[in-house]
Every structure is written in structure tokens, then in C-alpha cells.
């Protein structure tokens, strides 16, 4: 009995029952969506960390030529760090925006 070959199967998509217009409609789907967002953020953060280590290694190995030889890694690292963070400014407005106020009409 050995290990199965291949990669494990993970659920990588957003939850099916989540409604961004009314996120509190289904609390289970809302929690699953929040966990999905956090998981995706961690993946992006870890990718940026790996690229940062590659850039450090390239700078050490290439020495004075690192401007030309490591440019592609630096560009990948800068692209990976854009938009990565935990602030509200990177989340969809429907998840953190002001709640609409119901206006009652006078008859």
C-alpha cells in the first residue's frame, strides 16, 4: 500500500449558494465564501513570498548584473504583490459597502 500518485483534489471554486447581493441570506454560504477569500489571499501571499526568495537568490548570484538578469523576476514579484493584502479596499464593494437604507413612501 503506497501513496496515490498525482495531486490531491481540492475544491477551488467559490461556494455555489452565495448571493453577493444579499450575503446574509445563507449564513453557511457566507462563511464558505469568506473562507474561500481568505484561502485565495493566503495563496497569493505565499506566491509573493516564493518570488521574493527567488529575487533575493538571483541578486546574490548575479552580483552587479542583477539589473539585467533579474528583471523578469522583479517584474513577476511586483505583479504578484499588487492587490495583495487584507484591507477592505481590495474586497468587492458588495461585501463591505454601506447597507442600503429602505425609504418608506408617505401615502
Curated annotation (Swiss-Prot):
Give me the ranges of the annotated region Disordered.
1-23
Short name of one Pfam family: NDUFB10
Q: Which GO terms describe its biological process?
A: photorespiration
Q: Which UniProt keywords apply?
A: Electron transport, Membrane, Mitochondrion, Mitochondrion inner membrane, Respiratory chain, Transport
Instruction: Tell me the membrane topology, using the record's own terms.
Output: Peripheral membrane protein
Would the keyword Electron transport turn up in this protein's UniProt record? yes
Subcellular location per the Swiss-Prot or TrEMBL entry: Mitochondrion inner membrane
GO CC terms on record?
mitochondrial inner membrane; mitochondrial membrane; mitochondrion; respiratory chain complex I
Tell me yes or no: is Electron transport among this UniProt entry's keywords. Answer: yes
Report the superkingdom from the record.
Eukaryota
Task: Name which cysteines form disulfide bonds.
Answer: none
Its function, per the record, reads: Accessory subunit of the mitochondrial membrane respiratory chain NADH dehydrogenase (Complex I), that is believed not to be involved in catalysis. Complex I functions in the transfer of electrons from NADH to the respiratory chain. The immediate electron acceptor for the enzyme is believed to be ubiquinone.
User: What interactions and quaternary structure are annotated?
Assistant: Complex I is composed of at least 49 different subunits.
Family statement drawn from the similarity comment of this UniProt entry: Belongs to the complex I NDUFB10 subunit family.
Q: What is this protein called?
A: NADH dehydrogenase [ubiquinone] 1 beta subcomplex subunit 10-A
Q: State the taxonomy lineage.
A: Eukaryota, Viridiplantae, Streptophyta, Embryophyta, Tracheophyta
Amino acid at each position: 500500500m503506497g501513496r496515490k500518485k498525482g495531486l490531491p483534489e481540492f475544491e477551488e471554486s467559490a461556494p455555489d449558494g452565495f448571493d453577493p447581493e444579499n450575503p446574509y441570506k445563507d449564513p453557511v454560504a457566507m462563511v464558505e465564501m469568506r473562507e474561500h477569500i481568505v484561502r485565495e489571499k493566503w495563496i497569493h501571499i505565499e506566491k509573493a513570498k516564493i518570488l521574493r526568495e527567488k529575487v533575493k537568490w538571483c541578486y546574490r548570484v548575479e552580483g552587479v548584473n542583477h539589473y539585467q538578469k533579474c528583471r523578469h523576476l522583479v517584474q513577476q514579484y511586483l505583479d504578484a504583490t499588487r492587490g495583495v493584502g487584507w484591507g477592505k479596499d481590495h474586497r468587492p464593494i458588495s461585501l463591505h459597502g454601506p447597507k442600503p437604507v429602505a425609504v418608506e413612501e408617505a401615502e
